[in-house]
Amino acid sequence: FGSRHHRARRDLNIASFAVAAMFNARKKIVKEKGAAPTELEEEVAKALFDIEVSPSSDIKADLRDIHISAAKEVDVGKTGKAVVVYFPFRVWKLVRKIQGRLIRELEKKFSKKHVVFVANRTILDKDFRRRGVKVRPRSRTLTAVHEAILEDVVGPTEIVGKRTRISVDGSKLLKIMLDSKDKDKENVEAKLATFAAVYKKLTNKEAAFMFPDA
């Protein structure tokens, strides 16, 4: 009887720990209007929590005030799927400080999937005055938001040049030059197709990512 009682207590403790861990992990995601998180969002939130509490983590202090707002998978063709993680704009500066290291840690947990970070931004259209806004900040225009998304998607790699190629049929292709010094860092060269697929999904614009010597 004593052995069974001990096992029951142990199993209860394990179950209680698992519930507590999931509760704490849920704090790493804040959805708009109290919407329920998806399975993928819960996975990302748990991964962030695990990194934060890991004794070997060198970014645990930075992660304390960081949470996500959403996570989605994007099809990137032959290379499979990428995980796009959205962060509230108010914590984006904190994310940028550790972007490279945090992406690396998350990609260990989402094996064979590239991870891309994006900040939540709101576009104010030309009817912004109807919303009670007198002046539309440039940062809230469609062009500015798409430019910011471009910087987010490739981060922490830096963009060193852009040019637009217009085809005979009028279609546009944005060519993005990335800093050559980042070519061999963070598996960036293998992510060029991922950057293009994610940017297309988020903005509906075609873009090709490359290094200046390509």
Go through each PLM region and give its residues.
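Low-complexity, disordered terminal segments
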Residues: F1-R7
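Intrinsic low-complexity, intrinsically disordered or marginally ordered coil/linker segments
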Residues: F17-A214
